[in-house]
Amino acid sequence: MHMTSPSAKPLVVSIMGPTASGKTATALAIAEQIPSEIISVDSALVYREMNIGTAKPTDEERASVPHHLIDILDPLDAYSVMQFRQDALRLVAEISARGKLALLVGGTMLYFKGLKDGLDALPQADAALRAELDAEAALIGSPAMHAKLAKLDPITAARLKPNDTQRIQRALEIITLTGQPMSALLAQAPKSELPFTLLPIALEPSERSVLHARIATRFDAMLKDGGLLDEVRALRARGDLHPGLPSMRCVGYRQSWEYLDGAYGLAELREKGIAATRQLAKRQLTWLRGMPERQTIDCLAPDVAGSILRKIVSADKVPK
């Protein structure tokens, strides 16, 4: 293996996949073989005080390999695709300058797309317009706003859930500001050339039922001894958080909040939490299928990390 020459673009590996596909364990195994640092590509892991429901890497795992973009925000705050792109580009440059391999690891596919394709075609947020849209949503509800979006931008509406208020509002905001649907703007946006060579790896299950079983096992582990519920109780006790925030809309947290509100019992919480996680995995796999450049590896196969390592080595650009 050769060191990347100063003029050549460094190699960066993205490890994408649905929830419970083993992305973290795979990245850690790769980092044992090649000097690496991990950049989290996860819209839930950015939040502090949210550890159990996000399946955040443990302190031991984070001590063994440097991790970035984890615990960088208070749950009261929001984090945009634009912010992620800026942070990721900066971190890749810093990690490469240290002679290490940057591993982009996660399941927030919109972040991967934003990093790869850029977002220059989309206008900045307009606070006054957003306030108007928020007021309208409070009046008629998020599903009605989703129906409105479906008439104006059916492509974007099709990939958003009716209760995904934040992204629905953003899509409507873009239409109002530009007169064009977000899907059209993204399609015509000039592709911005990345300052690195990207090796996109997708961990996808050969048997969807096995992934579903993993999801159920993991959610049960989160509920064990009241762990997730205690975490959400502590977040509620702060007094400044509410279910409409991006952080509290994360899978598992929304359902736990509703359970603590008395909306349903523990058995239904488990059922709803597992169903929501399975839906998330389905959406993640749909996103991945729209990335023809990805190199797919069965996340259920033995030695997933070894398969990826062979692909990295064949790229012949890795730090020693």
UniProtKB/Swiss-Prot annotation:
Keyword line: ATP-binding, Magnesium, Nucleotide-binding, Transferase, tRNA processing
Location of region: Interaction with substrate tRNA: 42-45, 166-170, 249-254
Annotated residues for binding of substrate: 19-24
Record site feature (Interaction with substrate tRNA), residues: 108, 130
Binding-site positions, ATP: 17-24
NCBIfam families tied to this protein: miaA
Protein name as it appears in the record: tRNA dimethylallyltransferase
Organism: Herminiimonas arsenicoxydans
